[in-house]
Amino acid sequence: MAVRKSKVKIKTKATSETKAKRPTAKARKALKAASAKRTRSTDKPGALCTIGYEKALPGAVIGELTRAGVKLVVDVRAVAASRRPGFSKKQLAAGLDEAGIGYLHLQPLGTPEAGREAARAGKIDALIRIYDRHLQTKTAQESLGELAGLVKARKPLLALLCYCRNPNTCHRSRIVAALEERMPLAVDDLVPPPA
């Protein structure tokens, strides 16, 4: 199984809805050290995977999800459509269903159009700024709360799905960072074999 332990730790703006008080410097240092050692663990309050389908076939993505024990895919694309066969919403949901994996599309957690344009242009800093602003909207916060509830429940194990192969250049790393502000997480960034 191709699992890459992510070492991503990106700060997000805190709001009164997401965090009442900023952690001390000592707490931030401990959180940073813990996030650098991410691993799958059942003793943490939350565990999740992330996966991107760039350069992969649907069977490879589903196989990687199955090997990791994922039972629910949370699609965090703004537009759940793809020119790549098997990755549009209905096709993906059907393929996942055949493998015994559920599907949920949380469209409000998708990247707004301006962010997608920045990503296509390779302007990752702009993507992050745009997405961080978007993540503070009411609808995004509601969906983030729904996602946090699913992660806290710990069953089923879920995976955030988006297009980008590299989580470091994808908005799903920002979603993970926002979840980490709410709870400790064990995160696996799954990388399916390329086609």
Label the predicted regions.
Residues 2-195:
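Residues lining hydrophobic/aromatic ligand-binding pockets adjacent to catalytic sites
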